[in-house]
């Protein structure tokens, strides 16, 4: 959530930065916001006046009674009663206005950092660097579906069990999928300093509001809202949502906390399934495992001091790159433009891995600095050197998406005979097996 003080003091600057996101709809009705703000200020001033007047009259009652003047005391009591009524009405309206302002702010995305390239969509993203050279084998390349089926990938069974965009893995390929997740966790915890966590796969609405998925992106979530006993709807305050990413529970670890500077940075990681309805993705990546309703991911989250958050962004991007390099997978790093960034991000780097069958790079990790945007929603703060409570900065990133890494391994390490070479870094997790064979 944006700092409301910025919108009060310099709304033109905030709107100008928001407009660089280049979306068709306005993010904030500025005139409505300013009208509510004007009423809030008037009511706040009047409320303070009424409180002061009530306190003054209450003192006067005591003085009048002490002086043996019950008539004056009765007059003061009547005035106190009238001021209490007006005070209650003012307080109720003030609470309503603050709720309306909160709702407005919850719909406004984060301000892009000044270093983010300006653009309308993915075509405006800027390539920063590449690593690795895509191979050019002499044999005809297959995609991960054709490679994976003889190795235990069963998409038809996924459809039978659950519907489109679900997959079943058996035998060798299931083992490789598990090995990838274990490898990623071991690197993140053993080399990069993250604390491994086991988290719930279903969270409450407050957790999703804290990280920014609710209320704006509810259509992309799976929930229990319509799954009550005997078909009765579940009230919103008791509904649970399947996590779209373990960023949600991990970042919510610090919801409502006031940390010390000594506790920062906090580095957390978790391997979880992720669940997304993929609303708006109809017709995209319908073949194979690129875009699934359920997929596994190892997530990185850092909670840091504001002064070090952009250093942490570079560090986390390097942590994701290290995994791809250990696996020998060619990739490139993209700086996302203003129009392609996520709702809560101030700056994002995407890592895109080379997929030979598509002859293109595809996203395998997204690493974002949300600055204080999530922290304000979460009321996650630390006590700074001046002794004041200040929002922390939060960052998150994939380290990595397990299914897409599996896809990249199958396609980049495929052999002419249909086998798939296991990269050396993974062999300890595969009991020394050097290749998967049909």
UniProtKB/Swiss-Prot annotation:
Protein name (record): Serine--tRNA ligase
GO molecular function, one term: serine-tRNA ligase activity
Superkingdom: Bacteria
Assembly and interaction partners: Homodimer. The tRNA molecule binds across the dimer.
The record's note on its domains: Consists of two distinct domains, a catalytic core and a N-terminal extension that is involved in tRNA binding.
Cell compartment(s), UniProt: Cytoplasm
CDD domains on file: SerRS_core
Pathway: Aminoacyl-tRNA biosynthesis; selenocysteinyl-tRNA(Sec) biosynthesis; L-seryl-tRNA(Sec) from L-serine and tRNA(Sec): step 1/1
Principal subcellular localisation of the protein: cytoplasm
Record family assignment: Belongs to the class-II aminoacyl-tRNA synthetase family. Type-1 seryl-tRNA synthetase subfamily.
GO biological process: selenocysteine biosynthetic process; seryl-tRNA aminoacylation
Catalytic function, reaction form: tRNA(Ser) + L-serine + ATP = L-seryl-tRNA(Ser) + AMP + diphosphate + H(+); tRNA(Sec) + L-serine + ATP = L-seryl-tRNA(Sec) + AMP + diphosphate + H(+)
Its job: Catalyzes the attachment of serine to tRNA(Ser). Is also able to aminoacylate tRNA(Sec) with serine, to form the misacylated tRNA L-seryl-tRNA(Sec), which will be further converted into selenocysteinyl-tRNA(Sec).
Keyword Nucleotide-binding tagged: yes
Chain positions recorded as L-serine binding sites: 245-247, 299, 398
Xref: SUPFAM superfamilies: Class II aaRS and biotin synthetases, tRNA-binding arm
InterPro entries per UniProt: aa-tRNA-synt_IIb, aa-tRNA-synth_II, aa-tRNA-synth_II/BPL/LPL, Ser-tRNA-ligase_type_1, Ser-tRNA-synth_1_N, SerRS_1_N_sf, SerRS_core, tRNA-bd_arm
One cellular component (GO) term of this entry: cytoplasm
């Amino acid at each position: 959530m944006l700092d409301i003080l910025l919108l009060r003091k310099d709304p033109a600057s905030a709107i100008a930065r928001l407009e660089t996101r280049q979306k068709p709809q306005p993010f904030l009705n500025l005139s409505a916001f300013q009208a509510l703000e004007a009423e809030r200020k008037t009511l706040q001033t009047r409320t303070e006046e009424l409180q002061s007047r009530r306190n003054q009259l209450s003192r006067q009652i005591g003085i009048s009674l002490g002086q043996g003047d019950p008539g004056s005391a009765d007059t003061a009591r009547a005035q106190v009663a009238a001021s209490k009524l007006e005070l209650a009405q003012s307080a109720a309206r003030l609470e309503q206005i603050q709720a309306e302002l909160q709702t407005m702010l919850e719909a406004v995305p984060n301000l892009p950092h000044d270093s983010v390239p300006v653009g309308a969509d993915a075509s405006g993203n800027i390539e920063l660097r590449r690593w690795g050279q895509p191979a050019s084998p002499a044999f005809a390349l297959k995609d991960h579906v054709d490679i994976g089926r003889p190795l235990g990938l069963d998409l038809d069974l996924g459809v039978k069990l659950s519907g489109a965009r679900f997959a079943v893995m058996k035998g060798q390929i299931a083992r490789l999928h598990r090995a990838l997740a274990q490898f990623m966790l071991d690197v993140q915890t053993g080399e990069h300093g993250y604390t491994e966590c086991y988290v719930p796969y279903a969270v409450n609405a407050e957790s999703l509001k804290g990280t920014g998925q609710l209320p704006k992106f509810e259509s992309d979530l799976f929930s229990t809202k319509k799954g009550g006993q005997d078909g009765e709807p579940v009230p919103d305050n008791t509904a649970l949502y399947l996590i779209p990413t373990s960023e949600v529970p991990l970042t919510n670890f610090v919801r409502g906390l006031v940390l010390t500077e000594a506790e920062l940075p906090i580095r957390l990681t978790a391997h979880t399934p992720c669940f997304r309805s993929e609303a708006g993705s109809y017709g995209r990546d319908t073949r194979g495992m690129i875009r699934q309703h359920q997929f596994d991911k190892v997530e990185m989250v850092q909670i840091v001091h504001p002064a070090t958050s952009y250093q942490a962004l570079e560090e986390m991007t390097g942590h994701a790159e290290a995994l791809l390099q250990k696996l020998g997978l060619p990739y490139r790093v993209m700086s996302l433009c203003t129009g392609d960034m996520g709702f809560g991000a101030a700056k994002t780097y995407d890592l895109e891995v080379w997929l030979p069958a598509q002859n293109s790079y595809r996203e395998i990790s997204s690493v974002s600095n949300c600055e204080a945007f999530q922290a304000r929603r979460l009321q996650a703060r630390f006590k700074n050197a001046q002794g004041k409570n200040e929002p922390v900065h939060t960052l998150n990133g994939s380290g990595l998406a397990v299914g897409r890494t599996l896809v990249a391994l199958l396609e980049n390490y495929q052999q002419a005979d249909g086998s798939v070479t296991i990269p050396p870094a993974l062999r300890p997790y595969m009991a020394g097996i050097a290749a998967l064979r049909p």
